[in-house]
Amino acid sequence: MKRMMIVAALAALTTTTVAQAADPAAYVEYRKSVLSATSNYMKAIGITLKEDLAVPNQTADHAKAIASIMETLPAAFPEGTAGIAKTEAKAAIWKDFEAFKVASKKSQDAALELASAAETGDKAAIGAKLQALGGTCKACHKEFKAD
């Protein structure tokens, strides 16, 4: 239930609040926030695996939340928000927006695969899918995030 509320809130933000933001800097703050959430979800999954925590369904729920964020992430990078405020977003995002959308989709797909693995409870499979998701993040960062 809690996960569904989080996903619904994220979806509402991407389709309403972000779309209505008059200040381009609001997009920067929004995307920093959701990307930070993604990082924190991944860290939580890693801790759960490493420490063998008994938190039923959380890994799958976190992975599904990441997938939801990745599905809507490109909307947080509209024209006119490049170079606004302090950001690590490279101009390559707007120069080749289709490639950015493909990278986001790869992360979404990897997160859904992680969620599926998590539902089996197979820790080796979960670990492998978490690494695969991390690989999609790394590839996107290499192309679209400044150091």
Swiss-Prot record:
Output the Gene Ontology terms for molecular function.
electron transfer activity; heme binding; iron ion binding
Q: Provide the residue positions that the database annotates as binding heme c.
A: R31, T87, E88, C137, C140, H141
Q: Which GO terms describe its cellular component?
A: periplasmic space
How is the protein altered post-translationally, as described in the entry? Binds 1 heme c group covalently per subunit.
Any one Pfam family match given in the protein's UniProt record, by short name = Cytochrom_C_2
Assembly and binders: Homodimer.
Q: What is this protein called?
A: Cytochrome c'
